[in-house]
């Protein structure tokens, strides 16, 4: 795997980055999208994170295969009443992370509906990635094998994570950014299934149990 790391400073052309990637996090309310984002960008964890209203976003510049890439990370609300607002942000997204909670089977079952919504509103070339969050919890009801099977069915890369324990959080965003960059470099920008056929699976280690709603 190519070296992936956070970078800072300015390039010779006066910009602090070479390119921009717009990435969305989607999934039911309470699956931990905001906590994953805050852990990645700020390396912080708040177990009582306030539910996102509409849209929020953060920015982080990283090094992808020697290129400085600015990630625009959009955190979308999972509630039904915000769906009309959030789907407008799908267009132009280069990467979309579909998140479910391994302790809540309903959020796992709803991934197929989120996937359908992505196919209806996002660009065909958008790179998708499936994430099972809260892997540290001992109240898990969705197994790693179930997540992996769903990812295979949908043709998506798959990672399990814990924002609380910081398990595989960086891997989520770096893996997606690398897949996007590889697609850009190889000019794979067309076709109904372009960018949706990954075989990457990363299993987070199980940690201590937690009663947090944002793990």
UniProtKB/Swiss-Prot annotation:
Gene3D superfamilies: P-loop containing nucleotide triphosphate hydrolases (3.40.50.300)
UniProt record, GO biological process: ascospore-type prospore assembly; autophagy; exocytosis; Golgi to plasma membrane transport; membrane addition at site of cytokinesis; protein transport; vesicle fusion
Start-end of Polar residues biased regions: 200-215
Binding site for GTP: 27-34, 75-79, 133-136
One annotated GO molecular function: GTP binding
CC annotations in GO: fungal biofilm matrix; incipient cellular bud site; mating projection tip; plasma membrane; transport vesicle membrane
Alphabetical UniProt keywords: Cell membrane, Cytoplasmic vesicle, Exocytosis, GTP-binding, Lipoprotein, Membrane, Nucleotide-binding, Prenylation, Protein transport, Transport
Matches recorded under SMART domains: ARF, RAB, RAN, RAS, RHO
Major localisation: membrane
Pfam families the record matches: Ras (PF00071)
Topology versus the membrane: Lipid-anchor
Keyword Membrane recorded: yes
Domain of life the protein comes from: Eukaryota
Motif (Effector region): 43-51
Positions of region (Disordered): 187-215
Family according to the record: Belongs to the small GTPase superfamily. Rab family.
Job description of the protein: Involved in exocytosis. Maybe by regulating the binding and fusion of secretory vesicles with the cell surface. The GTP-bound form of SEC4 may interact with an effector, thereby stimulating its activity and leading to exocytotic fusion. SEC4 may be an upstream activator of the 19.5S SEC8/SEC15 particle. SEC4 probably interacts directly with SEC8; it could serve as the attachment site for the SEC8/SEC15 particle.
PANTHER family found in the cross-reference section: LD44762P (PTHR47980)
Protein name, entry field: Ras-related protein SEC4
Provenance organism: Candida glabrata (strain ATCC 2001 / BCRC 20586 / JCM 3761 / NBRC 0622 / NRRL Y-65 / CBS 138) (Yeast)
